[in-house]
């Protein structure tokens, strides 16, 4: 394996304290002015396709529509209206000779932005030219360039970020409103003895004249002025604004420009993370600079030609809840290079030390994240085929991402393709898929119901005490797993909806995502 050139880069957090302001209150909200706390479903922010429009024969990760892809965080702006000068949102250290290193705050002249996710840029600070990741920059003097602006993140995602125990009261961010077109929302961390840590959401309204306000008696010419004012005065907010919400650097879209089929020597395997029937997973580095996870497949697991064809499509699927495919070594033994998720598989995480401290609200949130990723798969008219906790990866702050999408179809092992062989995941597979090979997004919904039992039981194997053949027989006779201990009936009811015999009667992932709001699931448990 290639030798290491430098210390691997780990995603760093950015945190900025605002000037210690005068905390004097200047009045409160009028009687009609209250925080915007209307519950909004954690629906995906791109237009979704109703199930009725899905083709009758969905292709597995094929024929995608790139206009429905998502990158996260959504900060970089397009070159619109002649804007060519951008500002760096994060530090970036070049990974290849053609990359351009830059520091946060550096101004960059964009030379060419027509080649996808890596733009050719010229630094106005260093005078050097090279390729930069487009999601690391934003147009100069734009709202996207503000550290506190988080764009199109959901209410739930803002709460996940703000409720980090390290954040002091008054930590905040500004995001686009999910419910009011053209409006923004100010989300602020708070604490009180009754609720404990919580987040308040305030709608920022826009004036016809172009100004902004939270309460109409105090208006501002820009969002920047609004943030500066409330950093000094609570003036009706739960607390004055203190710290910008920290966030990690986003993943770049790919390892570098044109880094797709890479030489095996550019990868260094450093620590074995796991082993399965078809290969191993390693933590490693690419090019001596970049932390990655590497899946190594045993020779004969799948056709290199079929894998490469499928991987060309899979790499273009982008959603914040799907693990990103970075690069491949296409000659056997096949290597699959993906983004590194620090906490490993969800199954191991649930069964490990950290799993003991997970409570129902956190488990429901993890389920909602998985449903969000699968709702994207659903919209794109694809099928996962092997959805279970072992194929979900966990990162910092309990972030969950769906992995291994599409690979199950390519496996050539007889013990797997026989569908009832020792390696086939019978206990997670819908009966029509296990018995007749009918894999659809609805069979993925069945698997998601099984995954919910893994979450609520902290990684227990489904159908305890039953062997695979018995599971198939019992399920065909209408047996369904009972409600797990300490699981609310409302959540078990959602599982049972996923396990309806008729695939067309099972819910969509879009519906499941909306139902997995803590308030919907927890009211019975509490």
Curated annotation (Swiss-Prot):
Species the sequence originates in: Rous sarcoma virus (strain H-19)
Tagged with keyword NAD: no
Primary gene name: V-SRC
Domain of life: Viruses
Protein name: Tyrosine-protein kinase transforming protein Src
Alphabetical list of SMART domains matching this protein: SH2, SH3, TyrKc
Chain ranges of the SH2 domain: 148-245
Protein family per UniProt: Belongs to the protein kinase superfamily. Tyr protein kinase family. SRC subfamily.
Main function: This phosphoprotein, required for both the initiation and the maintenance of neoplastic transformation, is a protein kinase that catalyzes the phosphorylation of tyrosine residues in vitro.
Pfam families per record: PK_Tyr_Ser-Thr (PF07714), SH2 (PF00017), SH3_1 (PF00018)
SUPFAM superfamilies reported for this sequence: Protein kinase-like (PK-like), SH2 domain, SH3-domain
One MF term in the entry's GO annotations: non-membrane spanning protein tyrosine kinase activity
């Amino acid at each position: 394996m290639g030798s290491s050139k430098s210390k691997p880069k780990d995603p760093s957090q950015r945190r900025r304290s605002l000037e210690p302001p005068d905390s004097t209150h200047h009045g409160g909200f009028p009687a009609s002015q209250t925080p915007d706390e209307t519950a909004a479903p954690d629906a995906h922010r791109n237009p979704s396709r109703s199930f009725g429009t899905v083709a009758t024969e969905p292709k597995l990760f094929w024929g995608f529509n790139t206009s429905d892809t998502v990158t996260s965080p959504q900060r970089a702006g397009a070159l619109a209206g002649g804007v060519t000068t951008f500002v760096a949102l994060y530090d970036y250290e070049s990974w290849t000779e053609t990359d351009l290193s830059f520091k946060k705050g550096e101004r960059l002249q964009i030379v060419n932005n027509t080649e996808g996710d890596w733009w050719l840029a010229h630094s106005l600070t260093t005078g050097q030219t090279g390729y930069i990741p487009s999601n690391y920059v934003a147009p100069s003097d734009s709202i996207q360039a503000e550290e506190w602006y988080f764009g199109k993140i959901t209410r739930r995602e803002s709460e996940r970020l703000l409720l980090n125990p390290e954040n002091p009261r008054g930590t905040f961010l500004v995001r686009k409103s999910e419910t009011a077109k053209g409006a923004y929302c100010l989300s602020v961390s708070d604490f009180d003895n009754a609720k404990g840590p919580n987040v308040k959401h305030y709608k920022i309204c826009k004036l016809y004249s172009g100004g902004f306000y939270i309460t109409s008696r105090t208006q501002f010419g820009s969002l920047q002025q609004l943030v500066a004012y409330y950093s000094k005065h609570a003036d009706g907010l739960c607390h004055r604004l203190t710290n910008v919400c920290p966030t990690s650097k986003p993943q770049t879209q790919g390892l570098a420009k044109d880094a797709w089929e890479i030489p095996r020597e550019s990868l260094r395997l450093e620590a074995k993370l796991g082993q399965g029937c078809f290969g191993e997973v390693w933590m490693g580095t690419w090019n001596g600079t970049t932390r990655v996870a590497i899946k190594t497949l045993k020779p004969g697991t799948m056709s290199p030609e079929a894998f490469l064809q499928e991987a060309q499509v899979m790499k273009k699927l982008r959603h914040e809840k799907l693990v990103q495919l970075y690069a491949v070594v296409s000659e056997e033994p096949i290597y699959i290079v993906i983004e590194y998720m620090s906490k490993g598989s969800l199954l191991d995480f649930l069964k490990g030390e950290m799993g003991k401290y997970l409570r129902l609200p956190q488990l429901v949130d993890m389920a909602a994240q998985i449903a969000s990723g699968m709702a994207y798969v659903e919209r794109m008219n694809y099928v996962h085929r092997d959805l279970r906790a072992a194929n979900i990866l966990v990162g910092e702050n309990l972030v969950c991402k769906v992995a291994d999408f599409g690979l199950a179809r390519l496996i050539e092992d007889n013990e797997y393709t026989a569908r009832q062989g020792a390696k086939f995941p019978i206990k997670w597979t819908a009966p029509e898929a296990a018995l007749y090979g009918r894999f659809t997004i609805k069979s993925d919904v069945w698997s998601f119901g099984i995954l919910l039992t893994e979450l609520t039981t902290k990684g227990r194997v489904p159908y305890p005490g039953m062997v695979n053949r018995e599971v198939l027989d019992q399920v065909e006779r209408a047996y369904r797993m009972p409600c797990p201990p300490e699981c609310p009936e409302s959540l078990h009811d959602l599982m049972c909806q996923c396990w309806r015999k008729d695939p067309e009667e099972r819910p969509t992932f879009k519906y499941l995502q909306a139902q997995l709001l803590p308030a919907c699931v927890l009211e019975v448990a509490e």
